[in-house]
Amino acid sequence: QMSRVWGSRRAGRLEKEKIRRAAVLVPLIQKGGEYHVVFEVRAGSLKTQPGEICFPGGAVERDETPKQAAIREAMEELLISRRQIRVIAPLDVLEAPGAMEISPFLGALQGYRWSYSEAEVDHTFSVPLRWFAEHEPERYETELVTVPEETFPFEDVPGGRDYRWRRGHYDVYFYRREEGIIWGMTAKILRSLAEMYREDILLK
C-alpha cells in the first residue's frame, strides 16, 4: 500500500514554513561603455539595516515567484516601470543564517535616471562590474552555535547541559569602497557574480 500511495511522491523540505524567502535584483546599467552595478543605500529611518548598502529586494509574497518579487521590489524602490527592467538570468540562490533563502536575479535597467523612493532609500550609486572581477573581497569567518531555550529538557538528552551541539561556520565578505562598505549577503552575491563575469565573459 505504501508503494502505491507514495511511489510517485517527490521530496519536499522539512519545516518549509519556517524558511523566509526573499529575492533581490542585481541591477546593471551601461555607463562609459561598460557595465555598472547599481546599489542602494538604505534610508536611515528604516528599522532594519539603516544606512547599509544593498540591492533592491524584499520578501517573496505568497502569491508570487522570486523573480516577480525581485522585479516588484526594484520597481517600488527605484521608482521605475516594468518595461525598464530586462531580467538577464537567475543567479545562485543564497542560504543565509536564520532560515533565510535569497534568490538573486541579474537585470539590465533601461533609461534609469537615479530615481528612488525616499521612504526606503537614502541614495543610489554605481560601481563598474569589472572592479569586482578584479578585486577579491576580504573574508571573515563567523561561528554559528545552537543556544537552547531556558525550558529545554536537558535531562532527556545524553550529556545534559554538556551535550556537544554541532557548530557551523559562515563566511562574511567585505568590499571596501569610497562610497561605503559593501558587506554581508550583498557582498556574497556580488562575489559570485564577479566570479561568473570573470570566467564566462572577461576570460573568454
Task: Enumerate the language-model features and the residues they cover.
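Acidic, glycine-rich loop-and-strand cores that form catalytic or ligand-binding grooves
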Residues: 116-151
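N-terminal leader/linker segments that precede catalytic domains of diphosphate-processing enzymes
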Residues: 1-54, 58-104, 108-113, 130, ...
